[in-house]
């Protein structure tokens, strides 16, 4: 499995906050899904509240 860096923004009380998260995944699509899942479990956010701008290996 490869390590991907996912960057973007998410909605918070203070407006949009930038983020950079590193996830292990076999490809970019799975990395994107794991980032969404992490924000959902850690912050209680819906996928529509997270905007991913880049997925890089």
Curated annotation (Swiss-Prot):
Keyword Chloroplast: no
Molecular function as annotated in GO: large ribosomal subunit rRNA binding; structural constituent of ribosome
GO BP: translation
Biased composition (Polar residues): 1-10
Protein name stated in the entry: Large ribosomal subunit protein eL20
Family under the similarity heading: Belongs to the eukaryotic ribosomal protein eL20 family.
Organism: Halomicrobium mukohataei (strain ATCC 700874 / DSM 12286 / JCM 9738 / NCIMB 13541)
Subunit structure, interactors included: Part of the 50S ribosomal subunit. Binds 23S rRNA.
A single cellular component GO annotation: ribosome
